[in-house]
Amino acid sequence: MIDHVNSDLIRELRKRTSVSIIKCKQALIDSNGDIELAIDNMRKSGLQTDFIQSNRLTPSGLIAIKIEPNKQKGLMIEINCETDFVSRNSMFREFINTVMVTALNESINNINALKTRFEEQRLFLMNKIGENIKIRRFFVLIGNFLSSYIHRSRIGVLVSASGKINEDIIKHVAMHIAARNPKYVGVSNISEDIMIRERHIQMDIAKKFKKDPEILEKIVEGRMEKFMSEIVLEKQDFVMDINRTVGSILDEYCIKINNFVRFEIGDNN
């Protein structure tokens, strides 16, 4: 039996199995550096459950948010599991809270750094509850005033605002974002390329009506307004009062939304 293992072999075995470094090293020592034999031995001993679980889909999970007491820094995270049952598990929720607190306290801003920081705890939890668990994504938002909203732990919104702070209105805007899923705060946030592309598309559609250029231009303008009302927060009808836009509500209360982030379990963003 060998007493020293090449670090590259350990990394390769860990990559293929998701088992801890210590266990990978021991498995390679026991197999005299034969990685395939090490994997076989892991499977026989039950350690390979990590590998099996790590390849299973994780369609469920939770979105959670933590905002610092001064309301100027917050974090939203999505951690996935396989079933809704596990998403309600106290150990799973405690793991999420620990990840969030640590990320904020240690100013971790990179997803790979966060995954590395909690890999051992993740694997331990997987063995405890018997499901695959993945830290999918997180976002740190900094601003003058932060608010948030979570809908059934599956949709989360983190909002940064400034101006005359009205907590109720900002919370309602966060709820609106959860429901309507805008992509931008204002029209100025849309890139010129996107606007030009959409205008070309709408003009090509309008030309099929064979109208005068002036009428075609009005048709295109109307369609562009509709396009913006679908993706721009300030242009959308407010879910709390559909007779007004979000922008008009914000103007009335002298509030500015500087940025927002929206997560939904399983979306492609």
From Swiss-Prot:
Residues 83-86 are annotated as: Involved in Mg(2+) ion dislocation from EF-Tu. It holds the Pfam family EF_TS. GO terms for molecular function: translation elongation factor activity. It comes from the Bacteria. InterPro entries: EF-Ts_dimer_sf, Transl_elong_EFTs/EF1B, Transl_elong_EFTs/EF1B_dimer, Transl_elong_Ts_CS, UBA-like_sf. Keywords: Cytoplasm, Elongation factor, Protein biosynthesis. Gene3D superfamilies: 1.10.286.20, DNA helicase RuvA subunit, C-terminal domain, Elongation factor Ts, dimerisation domain. GO terms for cellular component: cytoplasm. Disulfide bonds: none annotated. It is found in: Cytoplasm. CDD domains: UBA_EF-Ts. Associates with the EF-Tu.GDP complex and induces the exchange of GDP to GTP. It remains bound to the aminoacyl-tRNA.EF-Tu.GTP complex up to the GTP hydrolysis stage on the ribosome. Belongs to the EF-Ts family. This is Elongation factor Ts. It comes from Blochmanniella floridana.
